[in-house]
Every structure is written in C-alpha cells, then in structure tokens.
C-alpha cells in the first residue's frame, strides 16, 4: 500500500516541502531563521487577531482601548506585549536572515532573493502602520513625519499625502485605514512567503561553502525539523523573557501619553528596527534626497546579485570580503545608534559619515575586494 503522505494531493505538497525535502547536509544554525520567521509571523497573526477583537480604530477611543486590553481583558497585557515584542523578534530574525543571505551568497537565487526584499518592504510597512495604532504621542508624530516624506515627490507629493491621510492632517480617517491595512498585510505576507518558498524549492537551499550540494543531500525530517525545534525553543525563551521581565525595554515612554497634535515630542524617532534607515534619511539635508536615500538603503539589496563579481559564491573562503562584511555590520549598528540620538553635533557628522560608508561599502568596496580576491586565487 502506498503512503498517504506521498499520494494525497494536499499532504503531498507538505511532504515535499517539510518532510522528504532534500537538504544540504552541512547547513548551519544560520539557516534556522527562515523557520523562525514563519513562527514569528504565526505569533503576530494570532496575537494580532485577539488584539483586534478588543481594539477600536477611532481617535477618541484607540488609546483607551489599548489600556482596556492591558487592564481588563484576560491576559490582555500578555497578548499586547507578545505582539509588540514579537515585532522586535521578527526584525531581529529578518536582519539575521538577510545577513546570512549576504554572507553566504544566497542572493544568487534571483527570484527567491527579490521576493525576499519585497517581503522586507511589506513587513516594514506593516510594522510602521501597527506602531500608529495605539495612538500615543510617538504613534501620532511618527505617522505625521513618515507620511509627510511623500510630499517630497515632485508635482503629486502634497496631493498624495492628503490622499493617504484622508484629510489635511493625520486623523480618524488615517487611523481607520492604517488599521485595515495592518490587518490585511500579514496575510499578504503569508502569501508572499509561499512564493518565496516556491522559488527556493525550485533550486534547493544554499549551504555555507556556496558549492553545489546535490551529491550530498539528507531528508529535511528528522534532521532539520529537530534542529528547527531547538531554534523555536530559543526564540520563545528570548521573547517570553522580554515580555515577562521588561516588556517596555524596546518601546518609547512617549507612547504612554495619548496623541496630542498640539504638543510635539522633543525627539521624534521610530522603533529601534527602523533607526538605521531613519539615520540615513536624516543625514541628508535635502528632503527629496533623504527620501531617496531612505528607499535606496533597502532597495540596494536588489543590486547584490549584479554586484557579485567574485568567482566564489560564499564569503566562507574570502577573508577580505568577510572583513568588509563585518565593517558593514558595525556601520549598521552605528547608524542604529545615531538614529536614536538628537540632531546635534557630533551625531550629525557621525550619521553622515556612516551613511556614506554604508553605500560605498556595498557599491564600491565589496565588488572591488571581490576582484582583488579573484586575482589572489591565481597566486
């Protein structure tokens, strides 16, 4: 009798994706983040669903409804903080996942990589809109500042901003539509994840060496299911430690004040995971230039396959590229730090230098170093 797992039309798809999938035998813990991102998405959708049952998207009651969730709903505080800190875990996993892709040359799978970059954009948009929903001071002013950036687009900018706002300022219409989009986007993300996996399974996974591993594959289950479960436990441990011991560690105290259009907070800043992009935006004095730099700081990821000039795929055997990669990581940490600082000396110049270095490393230094390493191979 044939196995149902291999013949049933629906279970067969799951079997080929998570059970009998041939996987390289040498993939390290850096390959765990895909499954962890799936877990993060599931946590966010579930906690978000329960929050949406009690939340009201009206400027008069939004802040109170979040307070009500935390005080009166059974385990509402837990659901709310799991959702807020779950977003932070989501972005930590995202950054590590993208970093892994850059280090080991996974971007040579064009379709998988490009869908991944689109996913990054959509997740960032979703997180931004979610941050607006509690309707605290930072929610309101963050929404005002970031949506206002679109006014830098020539000719249609101002009209576009008013169209997004649904009026002449961030108000009830803006909050309602942000809630609607914040609810629907995670499901669009889930659909894009399916496409991401579809393209990945066309080629098979990359591995640390960057070499073709078809001659040495092992089944995904039980080897990598067990390995993923370890990652899952570690992620939940970190998330729940954060949620139960210091849930507001990564948040902004200003968001515990209800939104007030008449009082601007001293330092408007986004959540920590957007600070690097915010620092790049602020480091350019021109509004349109800043917006372009902001968009290009993420969009530049799509150029990596074109800028890959090395004869080797992975950085595993390329010490010079490794060195530049870690300088880039340090630069991103610097940008994140600067994004949270006030706009004054010496932070302005540090931010500008870090922004220039970010683009120079990616566009010039990494490709140049790759060519040098190609020459060194002939020694």
From Swiss-Prot:
UniProt protein name: Cytochrome b
Keyword field: Electron transport, Heme, Iron, Membrane, Metal-binding, Mitochondrion, Mitochondrion inner membrane, Respiratory chain, Transmembrane, Transmembrane helix, Transport, Ubiquinone
Binding, a ubiquinone: 201
The protein's assembly and partners: The cytochrome bc1 complex contains 11 subunits: 3 respiratory subunits (MT-CYB, CYC1 and UQCRFS1), 2 core proteins (UQCRC1 and UQCRC2) and 6 low-molecular weight proteins (UQCRH/QCR6, UQCRB/QCR7, UQCRQ/QCR8, UQCR10/QCR9, UQCR11/QCR10 and a cleavage product of UQCRFS1). This cytochrome bc1 complex then forms a dimer.
Membrane topology: Multi-pass membrane protein
Stated consequence of mutating residue 306 to M: In strain: Isolate S60
Superkingdom of source: Eukaryota
Transmembrane parts of this sequence: 33-53, 77-98, 113-133, 178-198, 226-246, 288-308, 320-340, 347-367
Family under the similarity heading: Belongs to the cytochrome b family.
Cofactor-binding details, from the entry: Binds 2 heme b groups non-covalently.
């Amino acid at each position: 009798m044939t196995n149902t797992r291999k013949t049933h039309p629906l279970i067969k798809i799951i079997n080929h994706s998570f059970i009998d999938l041939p996987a390289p035998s040498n993939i390290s813990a850096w390959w765990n983040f895909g499954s962890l991102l799936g877990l993060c998405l599931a946590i966010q959708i579930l906690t978000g669903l329960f929050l949406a049952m009690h939340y009201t998207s009206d400027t008069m009651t939004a802040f109170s409804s979040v307070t009500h969730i935390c005080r009166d709903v059974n385990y509402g505080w837990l659901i709310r903080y799991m959702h807020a800190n779950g977003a932070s875990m989501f972005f930590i996993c995202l950054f590590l996942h993208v970093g892994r892709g850059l280090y080991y040359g996974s971007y040579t799978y064009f379709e998988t990589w490009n869908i991944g970059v689109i996913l990054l954009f959509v997740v960032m948009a979703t997180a931004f809109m979610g941050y607006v929903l509690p309707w605290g001071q930072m929610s309101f002013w963050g929404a005002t500042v970031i949506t206002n950036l679109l006014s830098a687009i020539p000719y249609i900018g101002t009209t576009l901003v008013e169209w997004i706002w649904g009026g002449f300022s961030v108000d009830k219409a803006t909050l309602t539509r942000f809630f609607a989009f914040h609810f629907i986007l995670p499901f669009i993300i889930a659909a894009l994840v399916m496409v991401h996996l579809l393209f990945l399974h066309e080629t098979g996974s990359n591995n640390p060496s960057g070499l073709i591993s078809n001659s040495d594959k092992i089944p995904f289950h039980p080897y990598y299911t067990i390995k993923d479960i370890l990652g899952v436990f570690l992620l939940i441990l970190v998330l729940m430690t954060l949620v139960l011991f210091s849930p507001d560690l990564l948040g902004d105290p200003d968001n515990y004040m209800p939104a007030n259009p008449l009082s601007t907070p001293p330092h408007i800043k986004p959540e920590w995971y957007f600070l690097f992009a915010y620092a790049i935006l602020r480091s350019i004095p021109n509004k349109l230039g800043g917006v372009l730099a902001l968009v290009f700081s993420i969009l530049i990821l799509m150029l990596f396959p074109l800028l890959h000039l090395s004869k080797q795929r992975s950085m595993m055997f390329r010490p010079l590229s490794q060195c530049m990669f870690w300088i880039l990581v340090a630069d991103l940490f610097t940008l994140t730090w600067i994004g949270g600082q006030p706009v004054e000396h010496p932070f302005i110049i540090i931010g500008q230098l870090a922004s220039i270095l970010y683009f120079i490393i990616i566009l010039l230094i990494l490709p140049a170093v790759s060519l040098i390493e190609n020459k060194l191979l002939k020694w």
